[in-house]
Amino acid sequence: MLNNRQHFLLGVMLTSLSVILYKEFTYTLPIIKTETIVHMVNDPIIRGNFELEANEINSSLNKSKLKHLLIYTNALCDEYGVDYEMVKAVIQTESSWNHKAVSTSGAIGLMQVLPETAMSEFNTRKNDLFDPYINVTVGIKYLSHLNNHFDDMESTLTAYSHGPTVTRKYSSNYIKNNFYVKRVYKNL
């Protein structure tokens, strides 16, 4: 039997999920199994872990929204075979958890996704990248795509930051020792 707080959290998650599913239809975002998210919301140990995690992160998002985003991110990482801790380290490195961040090169949001990449690879519009759920979805899908094209995590991270074409030209010594990769690993 669910208590009032669990009903509320489930309602919030299902509302968020319905928005995500709507965006799936219009923006080709992935559909995450409802049971996965409902299980994460209903399991007090899992929910508590995400609450603790959210409290430890200094973010532009409020703690409740951040907790829900972490649950979503974790489920999405499972769906795409991307390491959840690595994604959090990329977010910390790229934007320090500021969902409104815009870089000098025009990259947007938590995972600092370039609008050109979002549009060409995932049919996602520039302004949609300010939505943390869309931004994280595109970032994780892109990391998964890069992971399938490179042999190791250092090359994948370098490609995420510098682009896949440029990364293929770098020596393995540069890739393992570049500043971006070191910063991401420091944030693990």
Predicted regions, residues:
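N-terminal Sec-pathway targeting helices
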Residues: 1-14
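Residue-level recognition of hydrophobic positions within alpha-helical transmembrane segments
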Residues: 2-3, 20, 90, 131
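Hydrophobic alpha-helical membrane-insertion segments, chiefly the h-region
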Residues: 15-25
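Catalytic glycan-binding domains that act on GlcNAc-containing polysaccharides
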Residues: 27-188
